[in-house]
């Protein structure tokens, strides 16, 4: 049985890790290098590193920070934010990333997924989708959740997987930062639509939320969170022990 993954997410702005609620009002949390090392040493299965200003302001990723994070950690690193071209993939991978997450860049140019999958392999291409309900329909938002694309989220995810995305991070804007649990309805719809690994993001507030996620939706491969880990509300080692007690397969 494939073990489930617990993945802390570092949202980085101006070289610091920040975490807002519903993408508004950012608080400075810490240094990405310090936090990355802490998670690598304390049970995280992977790390996700987003430059959250990159897509909106067209800013290139902070490659110096990225190199330091990659040198410091011993777990797989996924990097996103401002990935718009194959050159962006190349730059990030050369800095030590294992996987590259594409969001707004794929919305602008879906062929980017196909080109990157062909060049680097689909295991390297992660589709990140910010999804919000609009009139009861799961809708894709771009530019860090600020711009309604009008696209149906399930159809978009299916299209991108067909193009070569090897993994999907589904971030529910409705539940992000609210700490009332993952968006199970949205995640179930995605899991039913595609066969690649699905990572749940947005809404974790407690260990129980992860237990519920993996019990209710066995098809979900990983749970991703930021603030509950950054503020030490949930300890990853303890979380994984708790999940293992519930017979959820974990790498301890």
Describe the function of each predicted region.
Residues 5-9, 46, 74-78, 99-101, ...:
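Structural preference for beta-strand elements that scaffold enzyme active sites
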Residues 11, 39, 47, 79, ...:
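Conserved, mostly hydrophobic/aromatic
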Residues 12-14, 18, 97-170, 174-175:
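Conserved anion-binding
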Residues 46-64, 104, 169-180:
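Glycine-rich, proline-tolerant flexible connector loops at the mouths of alpha/beta enzymes
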Residues 53, 62-120:
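Glycine/small-residue-rich loop that forms an oxyanion/phosphate-binding "nest" at active or ligand-binding sites
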Residues 57-78, 115-130, 180-205, 247-248:
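Alpha-helix-loop-beta-strand connector modules within alpha/beta enzyme cores
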Residues 77-78, 83-96, 185-220:
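Catalytic cores of alpha/beta
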Residues 91-112, 172-177, 200-207, 216-236:
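Glycine-rich phosphate-binding active-site loops on the catalytic face of alpha/beta enzymes
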């Amino acid at each position: 049985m494939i073990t489930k993954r617990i993945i802390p997410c570092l949202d980085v702005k101006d070289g610091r890790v920040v975490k807002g609620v519903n993408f508004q009002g950012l608080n400075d949390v810490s240094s990405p290098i310090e936090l990355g090392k802490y998670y690598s040493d304390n049970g995280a299965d992977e790390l996700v590193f987003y430059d959250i200003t990159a897509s909106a302001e067209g800013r290139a990723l902070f490659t110096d920070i990225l190199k330091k994070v990659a040198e410091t950690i011993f777990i797989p690193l996924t990097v996103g934010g401002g990935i718009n071209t194959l050159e962006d993939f190349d730059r990030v991978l050369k800095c030590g990333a294992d996987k590259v997450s594409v969001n707004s860049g794929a919305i602008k140019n879906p062929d980017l997924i196909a080109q990157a999958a062909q060049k680097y392999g689909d295991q390297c291409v992660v589709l990140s989708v910010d999804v919000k309900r609009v009139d009861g329909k799961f809708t894709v938002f771009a530019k860090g959740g600020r711009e309604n694309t009008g696209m149906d989220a399930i159809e978009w995810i299916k299209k991108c997987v067909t193009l070569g995305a090897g993994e999907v991070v589904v971030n529910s804007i409705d539940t992000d930062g609210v700490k009332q649990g993952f968006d199970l309805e949205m995640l179930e719809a995605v899991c039913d639509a595609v066969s690649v690994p699905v990572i749940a993001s947005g809404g974790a507030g407690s260990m129980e939320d992860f237990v519920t996620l993996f019990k209710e939706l066995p098809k979900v491969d990983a749970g991703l969170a930021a603030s509950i880990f950054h503020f030490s509300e949930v300890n990853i080692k303890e979380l994984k022990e708790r999940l293992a007690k519930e017979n959820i397969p974990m790498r301890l």
